[in-house]
C-alpha cells in the first residue's frame, strides 16, 4: 500500500478491520486536500484542532505531532483504526483525545476538519454540537470526494456555522469552507422516534442510527419469527442498531440475559435508552465494540443478527462474514445464530461453511431468515 504523504507526515496506514489482500487504502484525496489546506493556513503547537469522522485515523495521526488534536466519530472501528495507526507509526496513543459521537467534544477549537459522513443527519448533529465550542475566527472545513458530496452538506454548514464557499475540485475531492459566525443556539431534531405496532413499542433513534425514520424491511421480516419461550439463555443482538431485535426478543423471553453490541456509539446509546423505556431496570449489557471480538468464547447460547452489507460507501459481505465468524466463536456448543438477509447474498451457503447445521426458518420474495447451529 502507498504511504499517506502530506506536509505534516508520511504515514503507513491500514483500514479496520484488516483484510488479507486489502485492495482499498485507509485514506483518500479528500484527507490529503484537508491537510494541505490547513498547512497553507498555518498552525502552531498551540492550535486546537477537532477532527470529525476520520475513518481510519489518517487526519488525526498526521496532525498528532504538530497540534493539539481531538478526534470524534461514531465508529468504534474508526477508534480502533486510529489507535492501530498511531502505534504503527510510532506515535503516542495519548497524543489524540478521542470523543465518541454520542458525546460532545468540548473546545474551544481553532480549526475543525470534517469528513462528510454518508448520513447527513450525523453531520447535522455534529455541527449543532459545535455551537459554543469554536474559538473566535475559527474555520470549519468539510471535505469529501465529489461523487459522495451532497449539496445539502454545504447548506448545513451555512445554517449552523457561517458563510460557506466551495473550493475547486482537486483529485476529484472538494472542500466546503465555513467561517464561524454568530448563530442562535440551535435545537437538535435528534433523537427521532417512531411507533412499532407489533410488538407495540416506540423506537428511539439518535442521528446516525440505520433506518432512523422507520423500521428497515429486513428487521420487519425478522420480528415475527424471533425464537420465544427459550428460558434463561444468554443472547446477543449483534449489530444491534436501536436494539429492536434484542428488545423484542427480551419481551418474548423474560428470563433471557441480553447483550446488545454495535460498532456505532449512537446505536448503542439508542439501544440503551430504548431498553430502559421498554424494560425499565431489567439488567442488560450494552457495548460499542468490534462485533463480538470482545466476547468470551462459548459465552452465548443465541446470537441474533441483521448483518450490514456496507462500510461507509464500500459495499460487500466482508463485515457479515466477520460477524458470522465471531458468532461461531462466541456461541457455546449447541448454540444458534439467527440471521435475516437478502436472498441474493447467499448467506445459506456461507453459514454452511461455519456451522454444523443451517435451516431456513422463513422467507419472502426478498428476505430469508436462517438459523445456524454450532
Predicted feature residues:
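Conserved SAM/SAH cofactor-binding pocket of Class I
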Residues: 30-90, 94-95, 217-305
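Class I S-adenosyl-L-methionine
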Residues: 159-199, 209, 342-374
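A short glycine-rich, Lys/Arg-flanked "PGG" loop and its adjoining helix->strand segment in the class I
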Residues: 124-136, 321-333
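Conserved beta-strand signature within the Rossmann-like core of class I S-adenosyl-L-methionine
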Residues: 137-145, 334-341
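Short SAM/SAH-binding signature in class I
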Residues: 109-115, 300-308, 338
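Short beta->alpha hinge that forms the Motif I/post-I loop of the SAM-binding pocket
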Residues: 73-77, 145, 262-267, 319, ...
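Mobile active-site "lid"/loop adjacent to the S-adenosyl-L-methionine
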Residues: 266, 303-328
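SAM-dependent Rossmann-like transferase core, predominantly class I methyltransferases
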Residues: 19, 24-28, 33-40, 169-233
